[in-house]
Amino acid sequence: MDLKDYVRIFDTTLRDGEQCPGAAMTENEKLEIASQLATMKVDIIEAGFPVSSPVQFQAVERIARETEGPMIAALARAMKADIEAASKALQPAKKRRIHTFIASSPIHMKYKLGKEPKEVLKMAVEAVTLCRQFVDDVEFSPEDATRSEPEFLRELCEAVIAAGATTINIPDTVGYTTPAEYGGLFKFLLSNVRGAEKIIFSAHCHNDLGLATANSLAAVQNGARQIECTINGIGERAGNTAMEEVVMAMRTRKDTFGIQTQIKTEEIARASYLVKTITGMLVQPNKAIVGANAFAHESGIHQDGVIKHRETYEIMKPETVGLSSNRMVLGRHSGRAGFKDRIVKLGFSPQVEELEAAYQRFLEIADRKKEIYDEDIRALFSEEARKSTGDRFQLEGFTVSTGTKSTPTAGVRILIDGHVREESATGDGPVDAIYKAIQKTTGMDPEVSRLVISPVTEGQDAMAEASVTLEYKGDRVVGKGSSTDIIEACSRAYISALNRL
């Protein structure tokens, strides 16, 4: 495909996205997301920042070894140790990219680096030159580019192109720019940088002013041929450009943009749900493309129009992002075949053991809930699929007693390394009581830093999904649990998190 009529998608969910508070992921979780990104046909996956910690290094190395299809990138400051660590971590990958950066704005050079522009220019050239000794594909980012002097930015870009950079990324590091300014900056650079026609210019935007998507699209309209983004727009502060938004904007408004990505858009909903489940970062209902209300129509006038002709109020079909236009309803009389068929249609590839465990949970839920929808099935299957045969703790049962004039008391029965243990405790509410009982049973007392309970579907018998973030001895993990019983959902989430510590 000609690079000039194709926008590369550079996904940084595993690097920039993970910098969002509370979004830390385990190595296995990162690999799971990387696999989904590969299924979506993402062009480049930024797997992490190898020099920052042994855990980061191992995660990048494993993704490089086990993820087929996309190019795997690793971040490195313009420093020899960073670049060497990135190169080593990327070694198993078939397609490798080192992404090196250094600040270029006056405020960053003066107060963060304590360097003069000439020194920064020299460091950038040396970094790119060193990168090219290890890989053929090198990306360079002048950090805080949108607050940099345009002429210095031009000089810096020319120098790193001459040194061997194949992609130059123009980051709006603090989310300060506007579409007109950002588009104008790309137009200036592509028109004035010697060698610009030989490389790819990339957009990397943050959402501090709510303009990340608009800015990225303005860059594309002015020559950018790569967008750096994350699933659900997660990232530091207000987040990054949301992949689903820029991809669907270019697809839906191809008349305006005249250019496409190669993303398999039918995988967007599954990717969104996966990232939400793993990180515990909920998606707002009115979030474009992947929010629960994105394709909902409550107004009678709108409903009437959609029934008569979908395009009256729908500019894209839910099926294009992997959502079913018709919600399938299952119940207690649904068999394994129907259940498996629905799981597959929701985008999962179940193993025999996962399917059986999920089906047994489905039957339990069906005894309490008359109608089970796609959202319910997705929640319970995701929970079962995340379990491991090596999990130390399994919730066997619990009891709770509470009331307005009684002390909340909970008892739990937990299978620990094959042996059943029971304990009880009191607490400030039923959830606190059951968490304290679990702590007594397991001998672990992590701090609950975050607990979010949200309905999966509507109605009195709706499934609830709980997400709990635990902190223990320097580690932070997220656990998820679902049930029609809120206390059970919270208990399952807590046990799920403990198994990740």
UniProtKB/Swiss-Prot annotation:
A molecular function (GO) held by this record is: manganese ion binding
Q: What is its cofactor?
A: Mn(2+)
An example GO biological process term is: L-leucine biosynthetic process
Q: Where is this region: Regulatory domain?
A: 394-501
What subcellular compartments does it reside in? Cytoplasm
- Return the Gene3D superfamilies for the record: 1.10.238.260, 3.30.160.270, Aldolase class I
Protein name according to UniProt: 2-isopropylmalate synthase 1
